């Protein structure tokens, strides 16, 4: 079953089928108590005073009922009140902190992305995400080192649930079924939880559900996912100016230029499916990979190690996307189109995700852009529930987000460009993205990167229309120049011809007499 998940992604198996919180989220550790779980109330105090709930004494926020999207959804998930991610997060909590102004976080103790200061009123200079190949040696090592540290550092604020909501308090009803998790493994767990199957019983998964792919939320969900990791890494380093780099995978090549020991690890000579022992990533264990086992046991990924990271870039002639693919994708004016799913045509989102051809036409058996890059790298990354285990996931999605940001800046879409209803479950504009907590909607991330505190040092190709207009202008210029040259040549020919005719005329107009020299006149 797990091996078929990627085929489900690419459409080959159609039968299956703004208040920004603090760091990553399943649920804050402070809220995973028996009392909080039973009351469904996650409104922690800010600081030592228990009365300072949500920072209310400083005017930072207050505790209130969670707002959820009530609009109908479409798509293959037709069940109701079966999955604990429906109307997220009401199965777990129905009250949380609502933060005022630029305050944010599960207890309103932080600032929104892009803001700083004691009252969160100062705009931070945006951090700049750079091409990973343009980083200095120091910047590169800093990034790789902090990733490695995040793999082994327990997340300071959040824990993961190891059981579904009905079993969250354990057999006795007194023991929360939770586990600590490292910062990076938490990043992996969030992605897994957003794509995991709905369970109808032991070994009876309903696979036609995905909260982070195959719909409009693909771009906003992964954007927020990266922002959370970026902030966690900044805090781990003590460097608020740190920014995630990106990997420009639109090279058109059949080689992986980040699969080197200087970056994410070359193939291991004696087993090309594993990472070279010269790379720090050769030691990385994956988590959340055993989807079939979780389904059979009716449980969730608990963050346990499940084997070494694998990667085997394809050598069968398959090529990565090209810059022309990016250009064509950026030429799509419409953000998304009905049915807002993997079979949407002439949709920027679907072209970027990779179910459409870059020019917008639907071509289900084919992979493009984001999907093609995943498929090309092969190994652990091919399965969506486990894909984030490979650190290349971070830089691949950073580039995908850069394309999304470029599109936002070029077209300035209105809010209603995003469907309010009848997108697949989790993908309506005001749906709370699963499994982030406190709740954050798709709409809150549907803005330019600069508004969220970061930018990209990137020069993406112009749109197809711009290219065609440029080609037309160049063509008309060249055409005009050729016409002018032809006229000039014609004038020169006429001038030369005239000169030649004048050359055969007598220099003096002389009349000759028929009389001989000696005769009298």
Swiss-Prot record:
<dbReference type="GO" id="GO:0021847">
    <property type="term" value="P:ventricular zone neuroblast division"/>
</dbReference>
<dbReference type="Pfam" id="PF00264">
    <property type="entry name" value="Tyrosinase"/>
</dbReference>
<keyword id="KW-0732">Signal</keyword>
<feature type="binding site">
    <location>
        <position position="213"/>
    </location>
    <ligand>
        <name>Zn(2+) A</name>
    </ligand>
</feature>
<dbReference type="InterPro" id="IPR050316">
    <property type="entry name" value="Tyrosinase/Hemocyanin"/>
</dbReference>
<keyword id="KW-0470">Melanin biosynthesis</keyword>
<keyword id="KW-0812">Transmembrane</keyword>
<feature type="glycosylation site" description="N-linked (GlcNAc...) asparagine">
    <location>
        <position position="180"/>
    </location>
</feature>
<feature type="glycosylation site" description="N-linked (GlcNAc...) asparagine">
    <location>
        <position position="343"/>
    </location>
</feature>
<comment type="function">
    <text>Plays a role in melanin biosynthesis. Catalyzes the conversion of L-dopachrome into 5,6-dihydroxyindole-2-carboxylic acid (DHICA).</text>
</comment>
<feature type="glycosylation site" description="N-linked (GlcNAc...) asparagine">
    <location>
        <position position="239"/>
    </location>
</feature>
<dbReference type="GO" id="GO:0048066">
    <property type="term" value="P:developmental pigmentation"/>
</dbReference>
<dbReference type="GO" id="GO:0033162">
    <property type="term" value="C:melanosome membrane"/>
</dbReference>
<dbReference type="GO" id="GO:0042470">
    <property type="term" value="C:melanosome"/>
</dbReference>
<feature type="binding site">
    <location>
        <position position="191"/>
    </location>
    <ligand>
        <name>Zn(2+) A</name>
    </ligand>
</feature>
<keyword id="KW-0862">Zinc</keyword>
<keyword id="KW-1133">Transmembrane helix</keyword>
<comment type="pathway">
    <text>Pigment biosynthesis; melanin biosynthesis.</text>
</comment>
<feature type="binding site">
    <location>
        <position position="397"/>
    </location>
    <ligand>
        <name>Zn(2+) B</name>
    </ligand>
</feature>
<dbReference type="GO" id="GO:0004167">
    <property type="term" value="F:dopachrome isomerase activity"/>
</dbReference>
<feature type="topological domain" description="Cytoplasmic">
    <location>
        <begin position="496"/>
        <end position="521"/>
    </location>
</feature>
<protein>
    <recommendedName>
        <fullName>L-dopachrome tautomerase</fullName>
        <ecNumber>5.3.3.12</ecNumber>
    </recommendedName>
</protein>
<keyword id="KW-0472">Membrane</keyword>
<dbReference type="InterPro" id="IPR002227">
    <property type="entry name" value="Tyrosinase_Cu-bd"/>
</dbReference>
<feature type="glycosylation site" description="N-linked (GlcNAc...) asparagine">
    <location>
        <position position="378"/>
    </location>
</feature>
<keyword id="KW-0413">Isomerase</keyword>
<dbReference type="InterPro" id="IPR008922">
    <property type="entry name" value="Di-copper_centre_dom_sf"/>
</dbReference>
<feature type="glycosylation site" description="N-linked (GlcNAc...) asparagine">
    <location>
        <position position="302"/>
    </location>
</feature>
<feature type="glycosylation site" description="N-linked (GlcNAc...) asparagine">
    <location>
        <position position="94"/>
    </location>
</feature>
<feature type="signal peptide">
    <location>
        <begin position="1"/>
        <end position="25"/>
    </location>
</feature>
<keyword id="KW-0325">Glycoprotein</keyword>
<comment type="similarity">
    <text>Belongs to the tyrosinase family.</text>
</comment>
<dbReference type="GO" id="GO:0006583">
    <property type="term" value="P:melanin biosynthetic process from tyrosine"/>
</dbReference>
<feature type="topological domain" description="Lumenal, melanosome">
    <location>
        <begin position="26"/>
        <end position="474"/>
    </location>
</feature>
<dbReference type="GO" id="GO:0046872">
    <property type="term" value="F:metal ion binding"/>
</dbReference>
<dbReference type="GO" id="GO:0002052">
    <property type="term" value="P:positive regulation of neuroblast proliferation"/>
</dbReference>
<feature type="transmembrane region" description="Helical">
    <location>
        <begin position="475"/>
        <end position="495"/>
    </location>
</feature>
<dbReference type="GO" id="GO:0016491">
    <property type="term" value="F:oxidoreductase activity"/>
</dbReference>
<keyword id="KW-0479">Metal-binding</keyword>
<feature type="binding site">
    <location>
        <position position="374"/>
    </location>
    <ligand>
        <name>Zn(2+) B</name>
    </ligand>
</feature>
<feature type="binding site">
    <location>
        <position position="222"/>
    </location>
    <ligand>
        <name>Zn(2+) A</name>
    </ligand>
</feature>
<feature type="binding site">
    <location>
        <position position="370"/>
    </location>
    <ligand>
        <name>Zn(2+) B</name>
    </ligand>
</feature>
């Amino acid at each position: 079953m797990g091996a078929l998940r990627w085929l489900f992604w690419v459409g080959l198996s159609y039968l299956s089928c703004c208040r920004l919180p603090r760091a990553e989220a399943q649920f804050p550790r402070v809220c995973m108590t028996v009392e909080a779980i039973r009351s469904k109330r996650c409104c922690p105090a800010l600081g030592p005073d228990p009365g300072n709930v949500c920072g209310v004494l400083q005017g930072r926020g207050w505790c209130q009922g969670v707002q959820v999207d009530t609009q109908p959804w479409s798509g293959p998930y037709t069940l109701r009140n079966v999955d604990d991610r429906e109307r997220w997060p009401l199965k777990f909590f129905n009250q949380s902190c609502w933060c005022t102004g630029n305050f944010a976080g599960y207890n309103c103790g932080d600032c929104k992305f892009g803001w700083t200061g004691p009252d969160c009123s100062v705009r931070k200079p945006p951090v700049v995400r750079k091409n990973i190949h343009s980083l200095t040696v120091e910047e590169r090592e800093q990034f790789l080192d902090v990733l490695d540290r995040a793999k082994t550092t327990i997340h300071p604020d959040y824990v993961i649930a190891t059981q579904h909501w009905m079993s969250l308090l354990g057999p006795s009803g007194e023991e929360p079924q939770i586990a600590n998790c490292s910062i990076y493994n938490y990043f992996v767990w969030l992605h897994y939880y957003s794509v995991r199957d709905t369970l109808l019983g032991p070994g009876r998964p309903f696979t036609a559900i995905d909260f982070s792919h195959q719909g409009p939320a693909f771009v906003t969900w992964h954007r927020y996912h990266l922002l959370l990791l970026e902030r966690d890494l900044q805090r781990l380093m003590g460097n608020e100016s740190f920014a995630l780099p990106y990997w420009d995978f639109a090279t058109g090549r059949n080689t992986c230029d980040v699969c080197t020991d200087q970056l994410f690890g070359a193939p291991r000579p004696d087993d090309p499916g594993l990472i070279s022992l010269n790379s720090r990533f050769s030691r990385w264990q994956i988590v959340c990979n055993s989807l079939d086992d979780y389904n059979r046991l009716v449980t969730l990924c608990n963050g346990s190690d499940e084997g070494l990271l694998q990667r085997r870039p394809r050598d069968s002639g398959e090529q990565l996307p090209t810059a022309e693919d990016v250009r064509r994708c950026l030429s799509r004016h419409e953000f998304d189109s009905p049915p807002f799913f993997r079979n949407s045509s002439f949709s920027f989102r679907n072209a970027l995700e990779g179910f459409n051809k870059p020019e917008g036409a639907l071509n289900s058996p084919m992979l493009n852009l984001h999907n093609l890059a995943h498929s090309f790298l092969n190994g652990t990354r091919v399965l969506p529930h486990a894909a984030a285990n490979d650190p290349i996931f971070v830089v691949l999605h950073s580039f995908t987000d850069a394309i999304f940001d470029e599109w936002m800046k070029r077209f300035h879409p209105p809010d209603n460009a995003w469907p309010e209803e009848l997108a697949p479950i989790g993908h309506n504009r005001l749906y709370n993205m699963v499994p982030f907590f406190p709740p954050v909607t798709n709409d809150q991330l549907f803005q330019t990167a600069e508004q969220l505190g970061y930018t990209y040092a990137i020069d993406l190709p112009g749109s197809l229309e711009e290219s065609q207009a440029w080609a037309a202008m160049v063509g008309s210029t060249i055409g005009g120049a050729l016409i002018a040259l032809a006229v000039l040549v014609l004038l020169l020919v006429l001038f030369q011809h005239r000169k030649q005719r004048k050359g055969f005329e007598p220099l003096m107009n002389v009349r000759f007499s028929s009389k001989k020299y000696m005769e009298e006149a």
